[in-house]
């Protein structure tokens, strides 16, 4: 929403009437998702105990629903394993920007890919761009959203599991109690809930992220378990900061001396009100790099 001469100007999105036949045959210039390669060994994740524990819990939860072995969801709820009536559909990870939510989901997917491969099961992750969904007209936006779920269902088989990663889901699904809610957002909400309710958790799981938990619609929280991404400790932020500093030091300063300067920056930024996060650690290290190594004040 923008302010202009004291007036509220709300973006109006044109509404188009799309028939069911047109919806089924609609083709987009590009899909609103990217299929992430979970087989890659390399990762940009800096391993610290707090996040490692969080990722481990996520992997265990996903494996419980996706596995077909003993003590799995299918074992405990054999009569419901092929049903879409089970109320749990996935997670919403909350936390400040830069708290590692998206990276944690991708890393959990990578580890699950390796673990379930031993059961002959393939795991894939569709990384959904909410911006690509929102850029259409009303009618088109709903169909873009449906295309995500259609893709997930197109590969449903006994040896395939799908993770749907919705980044910043609050930008896609606005709470119906929010005064800024428009007809297009209400329609998107309805489409999302309808599609989610048709998912079988043993085949497809949603992992969403948000920096604004208070903006989530209650219906989202009733379907997706809300989990807080734990903030890194001060020492863990120093570990992350160290990875952004020259290994051999520079300009007469060792890496450890640069790290101490980065630690001071971290504390200064914390005192200014910035929440503890991996982003804060990297930002503080880059500030030191630019000043002490590059020479740009």
Task: Report the location of each language-model feature.
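Conserved AAA+ ATPase "SRH/arginine-finger" region at the nucleotide-binding site
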Residues: 225-244
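Short regulatory helix/loop adjacent to the ATP-binding pocket of P-loop NTPases
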Residues: 212-225
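Conserved AAA+ ATPase small/helical "lid" subdomain
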Residues: 1-6, 14, 34, 249-297
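Pre-Walker A (pre-P-loop) alpha-helix and adjacent loop at the N terminus of AAA/AAA+ ATPase modules
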Residues: 36-89
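Walker A/P-loop
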Residues: 82-83, 87-126, 151-155
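Flexible beta-alpha connector loops of hexameric P-loop NTPases
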Residues: 130-142, 172-186
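Substrate-engagement module of ASCE P-loop NTPases
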Residues: 149-156, 185-203
